[in-house]
Design a protein with these regions (language model features):
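Short, solvent-exposed coil/turn segments at beta-strand boundaries
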Residues: 27, 54-63, 88-92, 109-116, ...
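Short, compact, well-ordered microdomains
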Residues: 103-126
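N-terminal helix-cap/turn-to-beta initiation motif at the start of protein domains
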Residues: 17-32
Length: 138
């Protein structure tokens, strides 16, 4: 009986955390990395970031761009952008990136209005929080 209850609890938890394609619009915007969890369980936390990621998705395609926030609430950036292609398979959402130098894939493991996490093929999990620009000008 205990095994059945444990199985049902795990099933409920795993079903409740599934990310729906309708939620992908939440990825649009500015994000800063907060934590990296390595395969062995060790973590690295980031309290201050000199760059943030800007993500723009339209349907299942988009891009990610590195931005440098300034103290007046604006950003500096380059013309470089990493194309993103979203792939949905086996009830999972994958973010595929291709640049001139590399190709990689991350699985989206959590997504909300305030944060998201992805895991790469090396077992490293990246957790991001929504970035709020700082404006010190009155």
């Amino acid at each position: 009986m205990k095994q059945l209850l444990l199985f049902c609890a795990l099933l409920f938890i795993s079903c409740g955390s599934k990310i729906d394609q309708e939620q992908l619009h939440l990825l649009n915007g500015y994000w800063e990395i907060k934590e990296v969890t390595f395969k062995d369980g060790t973590k690295k936390e980031y309290s201050v970031n000199t760059t943030v990621d800007y993500i723009s998705l339209d349907s299942l395609k988009g891009f990610r761009k590195k931005m440098s926030p300034k103290f007046n609430g604006t950003f500096e950036t380059s013309n470089d952008a990493e194309p993103i292609l979203i792939r949905i398979a086996n009830d999972s959402i994958f973010m595929n990136y291709t640049t001139d130098l590399n190709t990689w894939e991350e699985v989206l493991i959590s997504l909300s209005e305030k944060s998201f996490s992805v895991k790469n093929d090396q077992g490293i999990t990246y957790t991001y929080e929504r970035f709020e620009p700082i404006n010190i000008n009155p």
